[in-house]
């Protein structure tokens, strides 16, 4: 089960992200929307439209803090760093790092020809002794720490265990265990300070000066033609790569060099096939990328989007890929993608890996997983027919769409107010459903109607009026969550028994979307008409629940205690109008009083002498107030 994860990329869509969130958390969108808990932090290029938490529940799409100071041309790196917990084994954790050449979109899954690389690491309770994988995790954490400093993280830092703050801290602590001897150099590369090509060359030099006889290069996007000294318009970057590799003695003078393209969109390559093939410095053969039949099935066509460099010697007897190395990542074979470090004018933020794989073969062997044409899209034909090649449509970075608002979220109060977490955040209007500014109060705004999941805010930046949606955190700390229905004690226990997970989605739940502005039918407190329930039956039901709660919470880990208290308060709040609670109000008894006994609490929270104990007692007090039993005699004192 996913604890927390960070994702960065150029673009993403709701279809992909919802699938990813469901696989990560194991919960469907409706369950995540009801939980209102942030489990994934998403950072995309600011040119991309915002993915709202009502559309991708459990995911916070973070905006850049200051567009004018972004230290890259494009946020193009495609990396995910994920932390998982084993719900069945305390202290058993798992880290996963994914580096992709594709965007986080349905197009990547269904149409593109892309590559991905991943590494997994167990943390139980100490991290596995894999120095290189530990170094990769630390490198990824450094990249995301740098990105988070540039983004608006106030929502993740909100004072609720459901904001993602505590879960992110847990995963950070797991990754911190990776920082120990022996240490190794990470395979993960990024362009915060150096270009990808510079880092690739440096890595090859450290590995040793072995000249390889084959080089395969592929990219989903190439740059426009540049006029060379001889007057011929031809792309120069492929030859720059070859020249750098030869100069570092990583490529032999007469090596075979193949350049893989999407024939329908290969930019300057489309008009330069002969120039590349006949180049006096080093011939480069242009070939079509091919989707491996072992992966996609025979005859399945996909468009190349992957970016890769693969080089090795080839055994004349076995066909083995000797002295092999592989780069794959987000950096296209362009100046901004491969040659430059990140900068606002000339370099993208890119990420990739440099790997030295063993056991691969140029020949189709008995083990399909070792045949290089099953691993890389390099099985296509040589392209000599210039009319069949197309440059594709030109592309330029779109204008920014996702910008940080002066306020990152609002907090709902029971009296119909939306309060601002930071009263000094500047002049901001909150617009109601009709687009009319809400009345301003001392600490926020007056909202007419039931609690919204999101609200639209308006402010002025310079001379420009801006609009953005911001989430609303409800009284239970849930972020942009769907309304809570009234439940009975059995359903309350179902929610508690599933902790730290979520209860199964019941039939009929999740059909339709209550939307951003739910109506009173969905949000108003509901007092169910009590069925005939005798005091004895109510006491038996309640005592069973109290015993179940005690057994459950005495086994909760200290790191999960705040989240448990939040779940306890939410579930019992939802049950405040059920017949059993109504019966206790009529009997003027407080049924929650036994939960204060030390035997019903874990050791670290058995009394008010600890912060955990005080937090628990405050939670019980709020539940008693919601149940209206706070002034009544304790249940255990009943004669």
Question: What function would you assign to each model-found segment?
Answer:
Residues 1-327, 332-639:
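Terminal interaction modules at protein C-ends
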């Amino acid at each position: 089960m996913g604890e927390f994860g960070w994702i960065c990329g150029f673009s993403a869509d709701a279809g992909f992200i919802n699938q990813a969130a469901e696989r990560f958390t194991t919960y469907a969108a409706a369950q995540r929307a009801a939980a209102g808990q942030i489990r994934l932090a998403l950072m995309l290029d600011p040119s991309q439209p915002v993915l709202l938490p009502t559309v991708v529940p459990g995911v916070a799409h973070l905006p850049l803090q200051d567009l004018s100071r972004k230290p890259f041309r494009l946020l193009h790196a495609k990396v995910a760093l994920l932390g998982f917990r084993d719900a069945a084994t305390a202290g058993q954790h798992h880290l996963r790092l994914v580096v992709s050449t594709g965007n986080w979109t349905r197009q990547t899954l269904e149409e593109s020809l892309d590559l991905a690389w991943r590494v997994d690491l167990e943390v139980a309770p100490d991290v596995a002794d894999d120095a290189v994988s530990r170094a990769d995790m630390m490198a990824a954490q450094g990249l995301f720490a740098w990105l988070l400093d540039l983004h608006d993280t106030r929502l993740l830092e909100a004072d609720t265990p459901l904001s993602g703050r505590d879960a992110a801290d847990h995963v950070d602590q797991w990754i911190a265990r990776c920082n120990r001897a022996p240490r190794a150099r990470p395979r993960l590369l990024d362009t915060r300070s150096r270009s990808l090509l510079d880092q690739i060359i440096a890595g090859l030099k450290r590995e040793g000066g072995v000249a390889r006889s084959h080089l395969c290069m592929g990219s989903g996007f190439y740059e426009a033609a540049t006029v060379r000294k001889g007057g011929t318009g031809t792309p120069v970057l492929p030859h720059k790569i070859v020249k750098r590799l030869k100069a570092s003695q990583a490529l032999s003078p007469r090596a075979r060099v193949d350049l893989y393209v999407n024939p329908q969109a290969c930019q300057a390559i489309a008009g330069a096939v002969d120039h590349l093939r006949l180049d006096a410095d080093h011939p480069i053969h242009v070939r079509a990328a091919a989707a491996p039949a072992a992966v996609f099935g025979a005859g399945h066509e996909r468009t190349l989007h992957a970016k890769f460099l693969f080089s090795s010697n080839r055994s004349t007897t076995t066909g083995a890929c000797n002295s092999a190395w592989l780069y794959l990542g987000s950096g296209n074979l362009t100046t901004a993608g491969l040659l430059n470090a990140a900068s606002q004018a000339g370099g993208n933020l890119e990420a990739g890996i440099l790997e030295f794989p063993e056991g691969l073969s140029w020949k189709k062997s008995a083990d399909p997983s070792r045949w290089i044409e099953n691993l890389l899209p390099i099985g296509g034909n040589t392209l000599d027919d210039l009319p069949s090649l197309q440059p594709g449509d030109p592309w330029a970075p779109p204008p920014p769409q996702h910008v940080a608002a002066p306020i990152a979220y609002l907090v709902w109060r029971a009296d119909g107010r939306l309060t601002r977490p930071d009263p000094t955040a500047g002049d901001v209007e909150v617009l109601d459903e009709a687009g009319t500014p809400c009345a301003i109060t001392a600490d926020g705004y007056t909202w007419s109607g039931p609690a919204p999941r999101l609200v639209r805010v308006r402010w002025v930046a310079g001379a420009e009026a801006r609009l953005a949606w911001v989430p609303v955190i409800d009284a239970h700390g849930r972020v942009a969550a769907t309304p809570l229905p009234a439940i009975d004690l059995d359903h309350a226990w179902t929610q508690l028994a599933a902790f730290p997970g979520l209860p199964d989605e019941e039939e009929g739940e999740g059909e339709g979307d209550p939307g951003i502005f739910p109506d009173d039918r969905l949000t108003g407190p509901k007092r169910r008409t009590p069925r005939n329930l005798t005091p004895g039956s109510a006491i038996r039901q309640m005592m069973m629940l109290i015993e179940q709660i005690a057994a459950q919470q005495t086994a909760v880990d200290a790191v999960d205690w705040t989240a448990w208290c939040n779940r306890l308060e939410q579930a019992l709040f939802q049950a405040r109008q059920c017949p059993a609670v109504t019966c206790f109000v009529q009997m003027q008894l407080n049924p929650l009083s036994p939960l204060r006994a030390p035997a019903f609490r874990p050791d670290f929270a058995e009394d008010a002498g600890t912060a955990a104990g005080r937090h628990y007692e405050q939670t019980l007090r709020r539940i008693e107030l919601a149940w209206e039993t706070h002034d009544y005699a304790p249940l255990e004192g009943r004669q």
